[in-house]
From Swiss-Prot:
This is Uncharacterized protein R558. Residues 73-82, 288-306 have a biased composition (Polar residues). Residues 40-50, 141-150, 236-249, 259-275 have a biased composition (Basic and acidic residues). Residues 390-423 form a coiled coil. It comes from Acanthamoeba polyphaga mimivirus (APMV). Keywords: Coiled coil. Residues 83-134, 221-235 have a biased composition (Low complexity).
Length: 465
């Protein structure tokens, strides 16, 4: 107890010294403690039982509301304990000793807990400050040695990617189909001959429109063309002066044999061997020019006399021609059907309504009475008759109408007779397989059977009655 009281007096003297310093300097503004550890130290000092009233007021004015409430409660508790100790002097010394020991233990535990809390808070703030400093240093180091981060570029959205895949698949399918068609066409087509340097130009073509497209079809060549070409080349020789030809007819004939050797054996071979003639003789030069022209004309005539091969039409064009012809045939069939269609295809229910509507419309459109009579007469007359109905008079139209009615009545009678079944006697007579005797027997049997049927029917009636 003595030790505890001495400690309390020391604490009070220290606090009084602090407060007296503050009161002596009124100009100074006291600031409350910032850290939690300092505030808790003030709380521990305030919990002591021997504080003065002016000290409590000072702390109450400068600390927050919650702290003041706690402080007042603790102060009141301490005062109650003092009163209790002063008034109750009759308690035993053992009880007082126990109470003091309890107080000492409580104070020790409070001091230990406060010290632990202060140590923990200080460690926590120190650790935070150290961590912050370490993090700052790490950030500076990373900024110095910072490398460019390769971020993944955002691709297009999934819908566009799927559309691209579908488009690529469609294009691949198309390319496959095109390759298949090309391979088929190449197999069907014959090997095309490559053009040579000596190849002649192709035959003339004719412009034709097939299925809305322009096509060029080759024209068949005839022997007339070859004759015209040869005649044109022969006319070139005639334009030259006739004097030179008259002077040297023998030389030309002799030179031709030398210039065109072996034409009968090798007609396709061009002129290769030509005898060298002296340059000094001018007549020989003229003969060479003329002989060359004759040789060329001879070769052209031989080449044109060959049979011309027919060029094949490509299969794609043939297919288009077939399709076009089939379309034309269908259109012609449809036109012919429309012409041949009669009113019989219309059902009888609707045919009468249609006829009535047509008659009403014609009667309404008629202006004069004579036209109306003509229209009514024409309605019952069929146009099958050979007479022009529009030019005929009304009297003629009436006659035609009567004749038509007679024909219709006769046709109806015939139809009724044809529909009736033949009698049994007529069927027997018309049967050529039977003899006359067999026919007579069959007819008698029919009459006998008919009598029996009548008798049976009569007996049945009597029995019922």
């Amino acid at each position: 107890m003595n030790s505890s009281n001495s400690n309390d007096h020391e604490n009070l003297s220290a606090q009084e010294f602090i407060i007296s310093d503050i009161e002596e300097d009124p100009d100074t503004n006291y600031e409350p403690p910032v850290n939690d550890s300092e505030s808790e130290n003030y709380k521990d000092n305030s919990d002591h039982s021997n504080h003065s009233s002016h000290q409590n007021k000072f702390y109450y004015q400068n600390f927050p509301e919650n702290f003041s409430k706690d402080f007042s409660e603790s102060f009141n508790d301490n005062q109650n304990l003092k009163n209790f100790n002063t008034t109750d002097n009759n308690f035993n010394d053992d009880y007082n000793n126990d109470y003091d020991s309890n107080n000492d233990s409580n104070n020790d535990s409070n001091n230990d807990s406060n010290n632990d809390y202060d140590n923990e808070s200080n460690n926590y703030f120190n650790n935070d400050s150290n961590n912050d400093s370490n993090n700052d240093s790490d950030i500076e180091e990373t900024t110095k040695h910072k490398l460019p981060i390769e971020r993944k570029k955002r691709g297009p959205p999934k819908s566009i990617v799927e559309g691209q895949k579908k488009y690529i698949e469609m294009m691949e399918r198309q390319n496959r189909m095109i390759k298949k068609d090309k391979n088929k066409s190449l197999k069907q087509m014959d090997a095309v001959k490559l053009p040579t340097s000596n190849a002649k130009p192709g035959p003339e073509t004719r412009r034709v429109i097939i299925g809305g497209k322009i096509k060029y079809i080759p024209i068949k060549t005839t022997d007339n063309q070859s004759n015209t070409e040869s005649s044109q080349e022969n006319n070139v020789i005639k334009k030259e002066p006739n004097n030179k030809l008259d002077k040297q007819p023998q030389k030309i004939s002799s030179n031709i044999k030398d210039i065109v050797p072996k034409q009968e054996t090798d007609k396709k071979s061009p002129v290769k061997s030509i005898k060298e003639l002296s340059v000094n003789e001018p007549d020989d030069i003229d003969s060479i020019d003329q002989s060359n022209k004759l040789g060329k004309s001879y070769n052209t005539n031989n080449n044109n006399s060959k049979p011309i091969e027919k060029q094949r039409v490509p299969p794609s064009l043939v297919k288009k021609m077939e399709v076009y012809n089939s379309k034309l045939a269908k259109e012609m069939n449809n036109i012919n059907r429309k012409k041949n269609i009669s009113g019989k295809n219309v059902p009888s229910k609707y045919a009468k309504h249609i006829e009535d509507d047509v008659r009403k419309q014609t009667v309404r459109n008629v202006k004069s009475f004579s036209d109306l009579r003509r229209v009514k007469a024409l309605q019952d007359i069929t146009p099958d008759s050979g007479v022009d109905v529009n030019k005929a008079s009304i009297a003629e139209l009436k006659k035609m109408r009567l004749e038509q009615r007679k024909r219709e009545i006769e046709e109806k009678r015939r139809q009724v007779e044809n529909k009736k079944p033949d009698s049994a006697v007529q069927a027997i007579l018309n049967n050529n397989d039977l003899s006359k005797f067999a026919k007579m027997v069959a007819i008698k049997n029919l009459s006998v059977n008919s009598r029996h049927r009548k008798m049976k029917t009569g007996n049945n009636v009597l029995n019922k009655e």
